[in-house]
């Protein structure tokens, strides 16, 4: 919803104003806004959501985004921003999305976001790891994989490895 043009604030306010007449899932840009709003991470030079961070209603808008799900269950479909790994069934996807959503609703949201994006030591590049799903992953790793799968991945290999680099059309 945000960071895809120069009207991020207007767009977010519009969707918020629709209340129960509209629903949305969190996407990677919305999540990036939350990270910048609730941690020490600064927006990138190209980010177009700094007006949200300075707006008088920023707390309301940030709380609204925090309340948005990572996945919507529709009658015969699931709606996500990026994708669902092939190892997950519907129950797995809903369960893992709920785990992340609960963390976003918790008392330590800023700390959770910091752990998810490796802000403490960015040289570790932890934000994209793990790239594979395993039931043996720690809760933190499961959350990071879930965020990356549902909101960030470009492609997913048959074995479940997430791919983030490709940004061009597939030929």
Predicted regions mapped to residue ranges:
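Alpha/beta-hydrolase fold catalytic core
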Residues: 113-171
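Active-site neighborhood of divalent metal-dependent phosphoester bond hydrolases
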Residues: 5-137
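Conserved Walker B
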Residues: 1-2
């Amino acid at each position: 919803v945000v960071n895809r043009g120069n009207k991020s604030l207007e767009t977010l306010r519009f969707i918020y104003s629709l209340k129960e007449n509209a629903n949305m899932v969190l996407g990677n840009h919305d999540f990036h806004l939350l990270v910048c709003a609730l941690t020490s991470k600064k927006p990138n030079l190209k980010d177009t959501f700094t007006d949200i961070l300075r707006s008088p209603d920023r707390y309301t808008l940030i709380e609204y985004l925090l309340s948005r799900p990572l996945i919507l269950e529709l009658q015969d479909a699931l709606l996500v921003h990026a994708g669902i790994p092939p190892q997950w069934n519907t129950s797995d996807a809903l369960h893992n999305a709920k785990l992340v959503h609960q963390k976003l609703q918790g008392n330590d949201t800023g700390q959770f976001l910091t752990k998810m994006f490796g802000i403490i030591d960015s040289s570790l590049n932890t934000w994209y790891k793990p790239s594979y799903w395993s039931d043996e992953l720690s809760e933190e790793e499961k959350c990071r994989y879930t965020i990356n799968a549902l909101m960030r991945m470009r492609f997913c290999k048959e074995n479940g490895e997430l791919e983030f680099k490709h940004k061009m059309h597939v030929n």
